[in-house]
């Protein structure tokens, strides 16, 4: 008996997760922060707690599973809108999203790839105190963070997923988000780490999120990022339950 189309689709999606996170070839990690051993560690890779030297994403399998579920939900529930990730590194999560939407036959949904493509910005006196305290700019060289738009495009092309449904928004979020040509969103995935980057995206794009859509916050564990989320939600009176994905990420579903 031939496998069902749904079975073949699901096999492709599960394989794509393993490829973008590179749990197949097990590349080592950069030594930075609390990581002192460069050896591949499967537990750290699955939970997205290392800095891969080769893999196209560092969010790990648990957060890829969450992205899978959120995207599948909006497709199956008929929630209209596109997908955006703000802070994409090498593009792996966006590549996964494009592959999944393609596998579900979602020809009308765009994947928006938003990043400075320069790593974290240098801080100024006007930045939020929690951003100044953590100073993410120091990680740019330590974990090979800055990735050019050209490299991310090449990564999409390697998977055969660089098409007209993939659009790039290059620049700092404070500049690109207010005028972003995004009309409607079904899933927005925030991975800017800082208070400023998180707030810039929420302020500009949350109103474009369809009821039933998802907000995923990759770095909810970082105090600056978490405070931005709660400041924004308190200001708008958002009471939708925040669910933890793992030790780092969280999400909520927009009740409308």
From Swiss-Prot:
Chain positions recorded as Mg(2+) binding sites: 191, 218-219
Pfam families: TylF (PF05711)
pH dependence: Optimum pH is 7.5-8.0.
Assembly information from the UniProt record: Homodimer.
Active site location: 65 (proton acceptor)
Pathway(s): Antibiotic biosynthesis; tylosin biosynthesis
Family annotation (Gene3D superfamilies): Vaccinia Virus protein VP39 (3.40.50.150)
EC number: 2.1.1.101
UniProt protein name: Macrocin O-methyltransferase
Role: O-methyltransferase that catalyzes the conversion of macrocin to tylosin, the ultimate step of tylosin antibiotic biosynthesis. Also able to mediate the conversion of lactenocin to desmycosin.
Disulfide bond residue pairs: none
UniProt keyword list: Antibiotic biosynthesis, Magnesium, Metal-binding, Methyltransferase, S-adenosyl-L-methionine, Transferase
């Amino acid at each position: 008996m031939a496998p069902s189309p749904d079975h073949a689709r699901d096999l492709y999606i599960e394989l794509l997760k393993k490829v973008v996170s590179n749990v197949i070839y097990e590349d080592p990690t950069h030594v930075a922060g609390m990581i002192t051993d460069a050896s591949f560690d499967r537990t750290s890779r699955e939970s997205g707690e290392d800095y891969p030297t080769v893999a196209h994403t560092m969010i790990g399998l648990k957060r890829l599973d969450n992205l899978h579920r959120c995207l599948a939900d909006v497709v199956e529930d008929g929630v209209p809108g596109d997908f955006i990730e703000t802070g994409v590194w090498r593009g792996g999560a966006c590549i996964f999203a494009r592959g999944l939407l393609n596998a579900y036959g979602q020809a009308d949904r765009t994947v928006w790839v938003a990043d400075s493509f320069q790593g974290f910005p240098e801080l100024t006196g006007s930045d939020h105190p929690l951003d100044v305290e953590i100073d993410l700019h120091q990680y740019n060289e330590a974990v090979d963070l800055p990735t050019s738009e050209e490299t991310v495009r090449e990564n999409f092309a390697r998977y055969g997923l660089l098409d007209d449904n993939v659009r790039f928004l290059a620049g700092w979020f404070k500049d690109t988000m207010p005028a972003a040509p995004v009309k409607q969103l079904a899933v927005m995935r925030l991975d800017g780490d800082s208070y400023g980057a998180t707030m810039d995206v929420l302020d500009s794009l949350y109103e474009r999120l369809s009821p039933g859509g998802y907000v995923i916050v990759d770095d909810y564990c970082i105090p600056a990022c978490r405070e931005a989320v709660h400041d924004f939600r308190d200001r708008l009176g958002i009471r939708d339950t925040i669910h933890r994905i793992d030790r780092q990420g969280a999400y909520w579903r927009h009740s409308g």
